[in-house]
């Protein structure tokens, strides 16, 4: 009778350890999906940052006196490129700071494109058209990769918050991941005047 109770206890402990390790592995897999998605976000933002100097130099040749616009784009690019985040340590505040820097670069690029409207000869050049198409494609990829990051973070966050896995997640130190959110300006419809 005593050996039977020991056997049941040993099996219960073994199953508990096995279940715990399976949950841990699931947490690690989900966390790595978030890290992978973040790497792709950084990749497309870097692609955009790499296009900016080419775009600025192309426009600069045709619009020499638009110096303040070029400086604003260059400064915004430098700021956006300087923020590096570790996805495993990322907080809501870190992500907001990163997003703000990227939003500033987007706004500066928007002002640059408005400046270009004053120069029809520049808009007609093949080099500018190519750079503009690449930038538009990159902006679309940014939106896609941000969405994928949010999906991976949502899946991970759901996993670590569901009972009973949330108990193990706390023991193992798995923390909630932040999401990309729309900038405050996105909630306001743009004013279009004809």
Where are the regions that the model predicts?
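A helix-centric hydrophobic-segment signal that preferentially recognizes long
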Residues: 2-194
């Amino acid at each position: 009778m005593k050996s039977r109770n020991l056997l049941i206890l040993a099996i219960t402990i073994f199953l508990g350890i096995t279940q715990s390790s399976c949950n841990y592995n699931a947490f690690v897999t989900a966390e790595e999906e978030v890290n992978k998605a973040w790497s792709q976000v950084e990749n497309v933002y870097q692609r955009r940052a790499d296009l900016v100097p080419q775009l600025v130099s192309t426009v600069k040749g045709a619009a020499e006196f638009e110096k303040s616009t070029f400086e604003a784009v260059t400064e915004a690019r430098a700021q956006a490129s300087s923020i590096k985040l570790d996805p495993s340590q990322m907080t809501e505040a870190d992500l907001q700071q990163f997003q703000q820097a990227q939003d500033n670069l987007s706004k500066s690029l928007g002002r640059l494109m408005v400046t270009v409207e004053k120069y029809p000869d520049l808009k007609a050049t093949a080099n500018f058209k190519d750079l503009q198409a690449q930038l538009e494609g990159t902006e679309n990829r940014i939106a896609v990769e941000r969405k994928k990051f949010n999906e991976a973070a949502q899946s991970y966050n759901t996993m670590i918050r569901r009972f009973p896995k949330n108990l193990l997640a706390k023991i193992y130190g798995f923390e909630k991941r932040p999401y990309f959110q729309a900038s405050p300006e996105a909630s306001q419809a743009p004013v279009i005047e004809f």
